Amino acid sequence: MELPKPQTVQQLSDKLTVPVEDLLLPCRFCNSFLTYIELREFDYKNLQLIWTQEDFVFACCSSCAYASAQYECQQFYELTVFGREIEQVEQQTIGLIVIRCQYCLKCLDLIEKLDICCSHQAFHKVRGNWKGRCRHCKAIE
């Protein structure tokens, strides 16, 4: 039985017994190698490594993550709800709804979700998935 492939940068580092700072992980979209900061951001955003059938592994650099998020919002936008309306639409509490940042693709934590709800800001449904603004992108906007 084949062992599951690592899904995070840290898991890949552990499996290969190579420090994260020594990993050379290419971006799936632009083929540039991710910097150390981007490798750490990749896991912080709760993104998953991309494996090919030939067992090549790829990640996504920050620039391509922003570009991909923007493209998805422009091409696959479905609807917008404000604040707690998302719970009515999804029939779930906010803590159980998976929401990613509409700009950088970071998976939002509960505090970020509640902040959007309490300030009655927008959640957007894009390609069947919910998007909002993370604390980092909110701070620079």
From Swiss-Prot:
One of its GO terms (biological process) is symbiont-mediated suppression of host type I interferon-mediated signaling pathway. Keywords: Activator, DNA-binding, Early protein, Host cytoplasm, Host nucleus, Host-virus interaction, Inhibition of host innate immune response by virus, Metal-binding, Modulation of host cell apoptosis by virus, Transcription, Transcription regulation, Viral immunoevasion, Zinc, Zinc-finger. It is found in: Host cytoplasm; Host nucleus. Gene3D superfamilies: E6 early regulatory protein. It comes from the Viruses. Plays a major role in the induction and maintenance of cellular transformation. E6 associates with host UBE3A/E6-AP ubiquitin-protein ligase and modulates its activity. Protects host keratinocytes from apoptosis by mediating the degradation of host BAK1. May also inhibit host immune response. This is Protein E6. It comes from Human papillomavirus 38. The gene is E6.
